[in-house]
């Protein structure tokens, strides 16, 4: 898949499933090659997890996961749009309802309202406006999104203010 090109690991494996590439590189990963949607999530026991991290690119799947985590009472953090940005210093953690200048977050809020969602969850986002459409993703920013999420989750799990 050409979207592998913005990933540090696996970028040379266009056409292969990301989960299988990562499972070969990191033996502790159990690859699940599935489309994340409401049907998949309905049979998935989220309650057994301490925290759920969303790094899905598909809006419908992001909404389904947020709703299921809310229903299950599971802590949840979601990654918003990191593409078309160059400055990792502009990455921040905010409520989904308080992001600014992030088209993906705006779409997520719209869809959450349509579903009658009145809850809240934190997101990792950037205050940097997205640049020109032709610009892809800069690994320095997308990787930093992942590091921000990892730090956020660890701090929450050990009881620190995130």
What is each stretch, according to the model?
Residues 1-162:
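Adenine nucleotide-associated cytosolic modules
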